[in-house]
């Protein structure tokens, strides 16, 4: 076993620990994130860079991924919106039966013609990424952004809770 891939939701610290403590200490754990709308990934693993607990290794070849605050400024070590600053090979060109209005509003309105994917993310000092979930599923009480993953992590520590659903 050389590589384990993970996708579908953010890979939490506990999952990294489980893989390295119970499956194999020297396996390459490659988490990735993208979308069905792009038929691909924005960020993911590669076989030559180090793997850091809780981080996705970096952006995928051909993707100019960045993290923007609400003013469109690049962030490092702060949470913000996942954006792709240049066109990419799998970028959809339009929506079916749309004159371009819905397509532009879905991806390009927020940051003036920069693709905004709608994921809440952090770029680390290692040039890795941590995904916190969908930005439209992020709660913002008193100006403090809380992703649903953080709420689930706390709620699921309660033995009496079998299943939960966070609604903002």
Residue ranges and their predicted role:
Residues 11-14, 37-40, 74, 90-92, ...:
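Flexible loop/turn segments at secondary-structure boundaries
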Residues 49-55, 105-107:
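Short, P/G- and charge-enriched loop/turn segments at secondary-structure junctions
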Residues 6-7, 32, 41-45, 68, ...:
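Generic beta-strand/beta-sheet core signal
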Residues 88, 102-105, 113, 118-168:
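AMP-binding/adenylate-forming catalytic core of the ANL superfamily
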Residues 56-62, 115:
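Short coil-to-beta-strand transition motifs
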Residues 59-60, 73-111, 146:
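Conserved ATP/PPi-binding loop(s) of AMP-dependent carboxylate-activating enzymes
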Residues 5-9, 54-56, 85, 141-144:
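Hydrophobic alpha-helical scaffolding
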Residues 1-51, 64:
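Gly/Ser/Thr-rich phosphate-binding loop
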């Amino acid at each position: 076993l050389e590589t384990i891939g993970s996708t579908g939701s953010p890979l939490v610290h506990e999952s990294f620990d489980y893989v390295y403590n119970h499956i194999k200490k020297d396996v390459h754990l490659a988490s990735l994130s993208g979308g069905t709308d792009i038929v691909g990934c924005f960020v993911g693993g590669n076989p030559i860079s180090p793997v850091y607990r809780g981080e996705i290794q970096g952006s995928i070849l051909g993707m100019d991924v960045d993290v923007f605050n609400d003013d469109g400024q690049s962030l490092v070590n702060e949470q913000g919106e996942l954006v792709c600053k240049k066109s990419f090979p799998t970028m959809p060109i339009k929506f079916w039966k749309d004159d371009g209005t819905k397509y532009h509003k879905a991806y390009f309105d927020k940051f003036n013609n920069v693709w905004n994917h709608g994921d809440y993310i952090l770029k680390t000092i290692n040039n890795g990424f941590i995904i916190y979930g969908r930005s439209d599923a992020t709660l913002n009480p008193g100006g403090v952004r809380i992703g649903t993953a953080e709420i689930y992590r706390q709620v699921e520590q309660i033995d009496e809770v079998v299943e939960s659903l966070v609604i903002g």
